Amino acid sequence: MFSSILTKVFGSRNDRTLKKLNKITEQVNQLEAQYEALSDEQLKAKTGEFQKRLQDGEDTDNLLPEAFAVVREASKRVFSMRHFDVQMLGGQVLHTGQIAEMRTGEGKTLTSTLPAYLNALSGKGVHVITVNDYLASRDAEGSRPLFEFLGLSVGCNIPGMNHAQKKEAYAADITYGTNNEFGFDYLRDNMAFSPGDRVQRELHYAIIDEVDSILIDEARTPLIISGQAEDSSELYRKINAIIPQLEQQEKEDEEGKNGDGDYTIDEKGKQVHLTEKGQIHVEEILKTSGILGEDESLFAAANISLLHHVNAALRAHKLFSRDVDYIVKGDDVVIVDEHTGRTMEGRRWSEGLHQAVEAKEGVNIQNENQTLASITFQNYFRLYDKLAGMTGTADTEAFEFQSIYGLDTVVIPTNKPMVRKDKADLIYLTAQEKYEAIVEDIKDCVKRGQPTLVGTVSIENSELISNILKKAKIPHKVLNAKFHEQEADIVAQAGKPGAVTIATNMAGRGTDIVLGGNWQVAVDGINDPKPGTVEKIKEQWQKDHDAVIEAGGLHIIGTERHESRRIDNQLRGRSGRQGDAGSSRFYLSLDDALMRIFASEKMGNMMKRLGMERGEAIEHPWVTRAIENAQRKVEGRNFDMRKQLLEFDDVANDQRKVIYEQRNELLDEGDIYSTIEAIRIDVVDSIISQYIPPQSLSEMWNVSGLEEHFKSEFLLDIPLQKWIDEDDKLYEEKIRERILEEVNNAYKAKEDIVGPDVLRQFEKAVMLQNLDSHWKEHLAAMDHLRQGIHLRGYAQKNPKQEYKRESFELFTEMLEALKVEVVTVLSKVQVKAESDVEAVEEQRRQADEQPKQYEHETASATQAPEQAPEAAPAARPGNALRDGPKVGRNDPCPCGSGLKYKQCHGKLS
């Protein structure tokens, strides 16, 4: 109560922010008349003037009013469009590195031109990031005339571009592109083998369109570049045949995994688990089919991959549905993005899930992949010096934006008042009754000439409603991932009188539905349109527009609630743009996934007790509150999962930064001799310590072992025993110096053969190749560690702390192994001429040209499965290696003193 009184007196934080921004908007408005009087040349010259002032040390904040006024005036001349004051507010929010919530139709694309121009003046580049290729190309081409008028270059970064095109796109002052492509380019740059192979500049400033979709919906799906691993397609087919023989356990008992069924399904967590009976049953089937030996156990360390295949097949059959999570296109399984409803061509699920789905659908099974590089959107976008975003629905997720990205959300007022009518939800007992009511609503709209957009949560549901409408003989269009090529045409005409459009979440986000249809699209479809034809099209559009307004504007029908209130608001937001008339209503049933999983059984029992007749709907605030509570539960759970993923990925991210930083330093350095020399000294010293422990007696030295090691690993004959025999005062420190001198002399001899330049080039190639190889193996080890880390909780240990500790140990071991590998390769290789260096480069190029997959790891794969692969025990460096049989603690000491080993030299060890 006290806080509400304070808000009334002082205004909300949002009100206070807007008040400050309005003062700057006034300054921009005061400059309008002055800039209107400038000629085109004088207006264009302002860009050079601003750049000079920035170079002289002036701050971009000081330039803001003038720069915004210049963009507004240029837009009036190039597009005949003037930025509204609310767009000026949005532009300021974006410039200050915050999120601007702007309703649909308020001109977010035009708003972004303001901060993009201002921040591009520094010459460091601005990235404008959208959710798909179509919007990236459209916005780049749409904004190009404005920016080029002002003397700035525009690039577009989309998939399929060659290296030169990408380089050119990133060199532009303002680069448009998709979030996926920017992320993958970052990973590819950090796999490059020469500085010229990299395409991205430093990450300076990014404006993210539909920021909620990218930073929240896709936050749990890491970007992964992977290479092909071994072929195990036949095993996937065999395991796939087992799944139909298993039965689901309907209800878990108190113990959780005992009962009559073979597996349980957790719809909330999107997980499937074998019961104890199921584990025994699967083992029996595997033995009968000859996959598992009679005396073998499914849970033996050697068979852990079999269990992995069984779990993947179970998930493929029981959790992933055709036309909901994926579609089958020819001989390929194509993922459907759960948040946008779009297909994700070329993307594959990780951990064998994609292969399991391919086996289930009977299509060609592609090889498994091994991760070469990965990053989450959360960590990629936090690399930018300044980050901003815009969307129509951010306020419900404001806490997450602030806590994870440090981004405040500012709600920008609409240019015209919102007049859309959001009607109360109607809840039915069954899905069939719900669909019957939806059809009646659509019929009523068609009769009155009101356009209707029907929103569904999956391709399957969109096709189900389409079939119902076909039976009712109602003409309609379907917009889902199967027909995404027609998206622009369908959305353009979705506002025509009586038009019915069924759409998944993709719903043409980024494209406005114009009431009466889009006359510009109709004109563009005519070859060489005559002025008279264009006028007729405009006249017809005006009649249609007026008729639609009279009928009530665009009517939105939601066929079920989404997991997030924000997605519901996005659907509603398709209607009521720029003060247009419109309405919306959601139709629900107790069969809907959200109601079934999260709404309590009490609601269903209450509705049944009310004695509701067939086809009768309930409208009650109590029910609406229960639905909103269910959505809040899901939002809270999803936030916790994203936060947990970030906490785990932050550990890997710190390591990724170290590796990529070292890698880039290697690429940029012409001569890495000093680095190689330091590594060589370190490795040689470590090897000597294994055989001649520091500060040890000569009786503890393993001389023959050390000689053999250098012979096998360095191809170097070191007569250590001879040195010792010749000099009885040859102490450990002197031995180290002489061995290192021998190693250095041998290396110098190689340099004399080929010359220093060739050897430096060879050193860099070997270093990069081994760094990438060890990093790849380290990523696999980290994946295995994360899958099983939850088991540490059973030992009363904190899984996150254990993950940090063990991942650090893995990282340290990886760096040590890398050093040894590099020194060993350089010592063993017989370099004869420059052609040897070219051979290594050619080998590297061939490896680099191997087909790679660009994947989104499935969100559910980020949760730890029940059984984690066992890690192979790692050899611990630094232990002295024995020469000869092991000496027991109570055996006579081999030095000949007559004492027991534990009382003599055993004390020292």
UniProtKB/Swiss-Prot annotation:
An annotated GO BP: intracellular protein transmembrane transport
Protein name: Protein translocase subunit SecA
Native source organism of the sequence: Pseudoalteromonas atlantica (strain T6c / ATCC BAA-1087)
Gene (UniProt): secA
Enzyme Commission number: 7.4.2.8
Organism placement in taxonomy: Bacteria, Pseudomonadati, Pseudomonadota, Gammaproteobacteria, Alteromonadales
Entries under NCBIfam families matching the protein: PRK12904.1 (NF009538), secA (TIGR00963)
Sequence similarity: Belongs to the SecA family.
Keywords on record: ATP-binding, Cell inner membrane, Cell membrane, Cytoplasm, Membrane, Metal-binding, Nucleotide-binding, Protein transport, Translocase, Translocation, Transport, Zinc
Compositional bias annotation for Low complexity: 859-875
